[in-house]
Design a protein with these regions (language model features):
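RNA pseudouridine synthases
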Residues: 1-404
Length: 404
């Protein structure tokens, strides 16, 4: 359960910001905590802070134990062991990162037919809501994001819905949300069984294979994948690198992956191609990595485009070793050395400031650069192969003929 939220939203420099707020959460204690002191539990479960920090927070009431509906006083907590049915109550000062503002506050506040919270509605009935997600905002609460997420914004407008699949924060496009668990389960089952045809659009570097064969007109986008001679298939495995986790856990196993690509239009002035992407499997960053390995990365991809990447060591590894387990020269020690390079370059990109919140002493983060909150990758079409539904969005501006 969560209480104490008083949310103040404002916009600044193209960003939607939430002022820091207090949030109180409560939950029953875990079985492994029984018979232990609260201070010992906090130190062992949350190792980022020293013991002295948690002692101070207990005295301030940040952490409380509720027993039989009555909170125990701080001094009592220092000597009382945790019992079954106790409730741990935690009060935190939340600092949410800003997101890209997709519309004015006035438009966000006023819902109209075909629009909710400033998001364009593609389709809606009693079971599902389909919207055109803007880039730069997470779909659901994750990490530091909570209020600045699509599902929480929809709740403020009277719609409690579950996302049926994942779209990254910086990816735009078609998002299907279910209004009940049964509808969510049915759609997710279709995706898992590959009964769902998904087509994305990406704007990539260079002249993509077979793009010389396409007709440069608006109708070209409507005939994707019809001519098999224009299809490029990438089948290299996909794995993830998570520098926030230690090696070897932060380097996942390689998994088979398939993506089909089809050129839609070529912008000769920019030497860039708009490509339709059909992922057959659903690995994390699959389309972005496959395009990078083909030598045609997404134009503004700050991770996988070599021209602008902030993570050159990670990109070099992923493109050089499609299946890292097959490389005999990559023993455990060499992998550990390389992984440390991934960690170092991630730390170098951390946008921290030298100011601290006076209330909770959290280090302030710099505002993100607006261009870092947009990726020219767009979920364009979703179609259930048995004909239950077929949805698509308008073309994003960067894919339109007059946006060369």
């Amino acid at each position: 359960m969560s209480t104490l939220k008083v949310i103040e939203v404002y916009t600044q420099n193209g960003l939607r910001k939430v002022r820091p707020y207090y949030n109180r959460r409560s939950a029953f204690v875990k079985g492994r905590w029984l018979g232990k002191l609260l201070i010992d539990v906090l130190v062992s479960e949350f190792k980022l802070r020293p013991r002295a920090y948690y002692l101070d927070q207990i005295r301030k009431g940040t952490y409380r134990l509720i027993r039989d509906g009555v909170p125990l006083v701080p001094d009592h907590l220092m000597t009382t062991i945790i019992k079954n049915h106790d409730v741990l109550e935690t009060t935190t000062h939340k600092h949410e990162p800003p997101v890209k503002q997709w519309c004015s506050q006035e438009v966000e506040a006023e819902d109209l037919p075909g629009r909710i919270a400033g998001f364009n509605i593609i389709f809606e009935n009693e079971s599902i809501l389909v919207i055109d997600k803007p880039s730069g905002i997470p779909v659901h609460p994750t990490g530091q994001f909570y209020q600045n997420t699509i599902t929480e914004l929809l709740k403020l407008h009277g719609v409690d819905a579950l996302p049926c699949y994942r779209l990254d924060k910086i990816t735009s496009g078609l998002l299907i949300l279910a209004k009940n668990s049964q509808s969510a389960g049915e759609i997710q089952k279709s995706i898992r069984s590959r009964d769902m045809i998904k087509i994305y659009l990406a704007r990539v570097k260079g002249r993509f294979p077979h793009s010389e064969l396409i007709l440069d007109n608006e109708s070209a986008a409507e005939t994707t994948f019809e001519d098999t001679s224009k299809v490029t298939v990438e089948m290299t495995p996909i794995y993830s690198i998570d520098p926030k986790r230690q090696f070897p856990v932060g380097l996942s196993a390689s998994k088979d992956a398939i993506t089909k690509f089809y050129p839609i239009r070529y912008f000769s002035h920019a030497d860039e191609t708009v490509v339709a992407c059909k992922p057959i499997t659903g690995r994390t960053h699959q389309i972005r990595i496959h395009l990078a390995r083909l030598g045609h990365p997404i134009v503004n991809d700050s991770v996988y485009c070599s021209h602008i990447t902030k993570y050159p060591e990670r990109l070099k590894f992923i493109t050089q070793f499609p299946r890292w387990e097959d490389q005999q020269d990559l023993d455990a020690e060499e992998l550990k050395v390389r992984f440390q390079k991934f960690v170092d370059e991630t730390k170098n990109n951390c946008r921290t400031m030298k100011t601290f919140c006076p209330e909770c002493h959290t280090v302030d983060l710099r505002d993100p650069v607006l261009s870092d909150l947009e990726l020219w990758l767009h979920a364009w079409k979703y179609e259930e192969i048995n004909g239950k539904f077929k949805f698509k969005t308008d073309l994003p501006k960067w894919a339109q003929l007059d946006n060369s």
